[in-house]
A protein has these predicted regions:
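Hydrophobic packing and interface segments
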Residues: 1-745
């Protein structure tokens, strides 16, 4: 066994250690006053309730699909699928603990310290649990399945329990493992997106529009459901989505390597090993970069001497007082902890630092690994020799960073697009929405060009293997990306807890600052997820084309079938968007009705009694799980419904149409939603002169934010998992389409 696999397991063990260490460190921090503890417990309980209900559905679906794969495809495919689902679900559980324990501690850090640096540290500490689990859990299962199945060998065959078929056991088991991760991601993304955005829209409609309540006013039951939804979608959904991408990209590498280099055992071993070098190097870079930023913001306490009178005047509320010590030498004086002497002004700088460190480490590890693995080999397929795969990986890394920067430009409050949307709000809702649509449309072209150029250059350097390696490079430091992404919902939750508990305005100012950055990091994360999905899906389509004897026939003949499939693929994704949007709207209507009912109960508006949060939480969970059925079936069943009656050719067209449509629409929806959200945030932060919070411009911005909610947190995030699921299902069913389809036309 090559030394890289031993190194992989050592790094994974280090990741598991740091996950435990960071969770213990997180729980050491105080949750705050009694009301803060109570609010956090409700959010934690609600998130757990949703996941438990979702688990019942996941167990049934995974069980049925696993049995089908074991009976029809390969005997060990089902267990591998179950392993993938279990590891994905375990990663979600750990990440959710980081979010639901980190949110209130982030609030308390802002309350007690008044320092952005300390608040960032707690939020990133919670986010690191998500970031470390994604590559660690995804990689450990993938490596075990790969090695136990035989490793880099094209001659390992397997058989189903029902038929005497002969398949490559390694590729079918890895595909099944990836599909297990994919199905969990589909549940979390579709159900989680419906949950969070139905609650968010209902909270805004009932609270802000109908009753003039603040966003996180505790009288509005949907406000608590909204905070739970942030964890469910932006943490659980993001973890499972990017874990599936992290697994799908090396899968594409190995599938293509098995098809392209099966006649050359040495080359097959090298091309199958290199993705593990990049993924292991990426995990190392994540651990080092995230821990560096966490530890960097650890100290720098600032204490100020105050008289008792000054202290009591500044901090009259005993529940919101900072730490202090009575000075024995000076009776009547206190030494008060007021913050940190080296606080930071721009939180995004700390997060960008982690990304930069990760990218540099991966590139260094990658060039060393490429030299050790491919150095000295004569490889005609590699135009630049041994360094070609590394260049392809760097293209993926550069694409990831570039897409992130472009996304930041179109969605951050610091730049013109969001500022222009906020200014358009002065003229009313129609102008604001039109400006937002224009910004979103313009934001699509450059990322698509970057993705396209990277694919073309990677293909020119290493063939189709290069495209898959570029995807691995893009996702190699996914742990850093996920850590930063999880920072967003934790900061958002922290702000919600601060508002619902009536904490001082200074606390909300800090959490709002972090929340605005979190909105941008979430948009960047969505951009990276979409870009990586494009690379992975194209690589999987290429693998699908080469997976059966009729490959040449598919690409040159039956053009009509391919074109029909292309049109159907486009239509399926557009229909998918419509179903998601309508389902979220229906769920929001039901939640809004429940919120109105409870606000009309005696004493709720007067704050003499609390509403029943559990009723709204359970309603949101039931709606989400009910409405996820059709879109999930659409993604899983579409290739099968077309492939079995009409053959494999039409499926190629369907995949191509679906990928093209999904990538463009995902970027459009993600950036539109992020820009609308931060345009509202810009006004709420007082940055639109003469138009404060509560003004007509702010009301218009709320409308834009409500429209953008479904676009970015439901549609955009579900499109990328949809095309990955369709591509993975198609790869696993390719031989069945070829050998058993009815070929009606």
């Amino acid at each position: 066994m090559p030394v890289v696999y031993y190194a992989t397991f050592v790094v994974i063990a280090c990741a598991f250690f740091l996950i435990g260490r960071n969770f213990i460190d997180l729980k050491r921090h105080d949750e705050g006053n009694e009301l803060m503890v109570e609010r956090a417990a409700i959010i934690r309980s609600g998130a757990n309730t949703f996941l438990k209900r979702e688990d019942r559905a996941i167990v049934v679906v995974i069980g049925i699909v696993a049995i089908f794969y074991t009976l029809i495809h390969e005997a060990w495919a089902g267990p591998c699928m179950i392993l993938g689902a279990l590891l994905a679900r375990s990663a979600v559980e750990i990440g959710m603990r980081g979010g639901t324990y980190g949110n209130v501690r982030t609030t308390n850090a802002a309350r007690v310290t008044g320092a952005v640096s300390r608040t960032i540290r707690i939020a990133l500490l919670g986010g690191s649990l998500s970031g470390f689990t994604v590559p660690a859990f995804g990689l450990v299962g993938f490596t075990i399945v790969f090695l136990v199945s035989g490793g880099a060998r094209a001659d390992v065959t397997g058989h189903s329990l029902l038929f005497a078929n002969s398949v490559n056991a390694i590729t079918i088991r890895l595909t099944a493992y990836s599909l297990g991760c994919s199905l969990v991601a589909m549940f979390n993304r579709v159900a989680g997106g419906t949950y969070t955005k139905s609650a968010d829209i209902a909270a805004d409609t009932v609270g802000k529009k109908n009753h003039g309540l603040d966003e996180d006013d505790p009288r509005n039951v949907c406000s608590i459901a909204d905070l739970i939804g942030d964890c469910v979608n932006d943490i659980a959904g993001n973890i499972s989505d990017l874990l599936e991408s992290f697994v799908a990209t090396p899968l594409a590498c190995i599938l293509i390597a098995m098809q392209t280099f099966k006649a050359d055992p040495r080359m097959l071993t090298a091309t199958c090993t290199f993705p593990f070098v990049l993924m292991t190097g990426g995990l190392v870079s994540t651990l080092l970069s995230v821990m560096f930023v966490i530890l960097k913001n650890r100290k720098h306490h600032k204490w100020v001497m105050m008289t008792d009178a000054e202290f009591n005047e500044k901090y009259p509320d005993e529940t919101n007082q900072p730490k202090y010590h009575d000075v024995a030498e000076k009776p009547g004086f206190k030494l008060v902890h007021v913050g940190y002497s080296l606080d930071i002004e721009d939180p995004s700088g700390e997060l960008n630092l982690a990304t930069a460190i990760s990218a540099i480490i991966v590139m260094v590890v990658g060039v060393y690994g490429a030299n050790r693995i491919f150095g000295g080999m004569a490889i005609p397929e590699f135009k630049l020799g041994w360094i070609s795969p590394w260049v392809a990986a760097v293209l993926g890394i550069v694409s990831s960073v570039a897409i992130g920067k472009i996304t930041e430009y179109y969605t951050s409050t610091k730049y013109a697009p969001v500022q222009d949307i906020a200014k358009a709000a002065i003229e009313g809702e129609a102008f604001l929405v039109s400006e937002g649509i224009a910004v979103a449309c313009k934001s699509v072209l450059t990322p698509v060009i970057i993705i396209g150029v990277s694919m073309l250059v990677s293909n020119a350097l290493c063939g189709t293997y290069g495209i898959a390696i570029a995807a691995v490079g893009m996702l190699s430091f996914v742990g850093t990306t996920v850590s930063i992404d999880a920072f967003g919902p934790i900061a958002d939750n922290a702000g919600g807890i601060a508002e619902s508990c009536g904490l001082p305005e200074e606390v909300r100012e800090i959490t709002d600052q972090l929340d605005a950055v979190g909105n941008t990091t979430a948009a960047i994360g969505k951009g990276n997820a979409i870009g990586s999905a494009a690379f992975a899906a194209v690589a999987l389509i290429i693998s699908y084309i080469g997976s059966y004897p009729a490959a040449d026939h598919i690409t040159t003949g039956l053009i009509v079938s391919v074109l029909v499939g292309l049109i159907l693929g486009c239509a399926v994704e557009i229909y998918f968007i419509g179903v998601l949007t309508k389902n979220t709207e229906r769920a929001a209507e039901k939640l809004a009705d429940e919120a109105e009912r409870q606000l009309n109960l005696p004493g709720v508006m007067e704050k003499t009694r609390l509403p029943n949060y559990n009723e709204a939480i359970e309603l949101a969970a039931d709606n989400a799980l009910h409405y996820m059925l059709v879109p999930s079936i659409l993604s899983v069943a579409s290739p099968i419904v077309l492939g079995i009656p009409f053959g494999p050719d039409i499926v190629i067209g369907m995949l191509a149409g679906a990928v093209g449509t999904a990538i463009v629409m995902a970027i459009y929806n993600a950036n539109a939603g992020g820009a609308f959200d931060n345009a509202k945030k810009l006004i709420e932060m007082g940055l639109l002169s003469g138009h404060p919070k509560g003004s007509p411009a702010h009301s218009a911005a709320i409308v834009g934010d409500t429209i953008g909610d479904i676009m970015k947190d439901v549609v955009a995030v579900c499109l990328d998992i949809s095309i990955k699921t369709m591509s993975t299902v198609s790869n696993s069913m390719a031989m069945l389409f070829y050998s058993s389809s009815l070929r009606l036309f």
